[in-house]
Amino acid sequence: MNLTKKIFKFLAENIKLNNLQNVKIFNVALGEKNDSVFFSSKRSDDLNSVSITEQGEEISLCKLDDLPINESKINLMKIDVLGYEKFVFEGAKKILKITECIHLPIIPSDCERYGYDFNDIFEMLRNLGFQLFTFSEKNISAIKSNFNSNTQDILAVKDLEGFLARTKYTLVK
């Protein structure tokens, strides 16, 4: 999902240029409901996000569960939505049931901008059967319930043994 028309066009051209066949792209924002939202239009595209002030480009908002994704299993989901993770996950209950691993950056101040604490995401993922880890290089460490960080990349994993065997990561205790 890439929202601004400019970035979506770049993505579509990149897919065509690289002759990728098994890729579907959707020019929508993901969230907890089907509606519309405003998306910021900052010069630096990597800083754009759902606007809380109703300024920017108006775009369609839909639940991930409502996209035409016909997979029986998702090995890895990458989510990077600058604090909107909680709402994406709320609209992805079915998809998360078939997802084995999620990679997401957590920036507490981004979560706070949308009125929730990053631990809300952790609780939601744990309730869906995920174990949470920080990682560095080829090492992962379990996240304790009192986790506190300014910025951290997180792995949410359902089958730890399978993940370790597949990736050759090491669990650091």
Where are these regions (language model features)?
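Phosphate/nucleotide-binding beta-alpha loop and adjacent structural elements of enzyme active sites
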Residues: 1-173
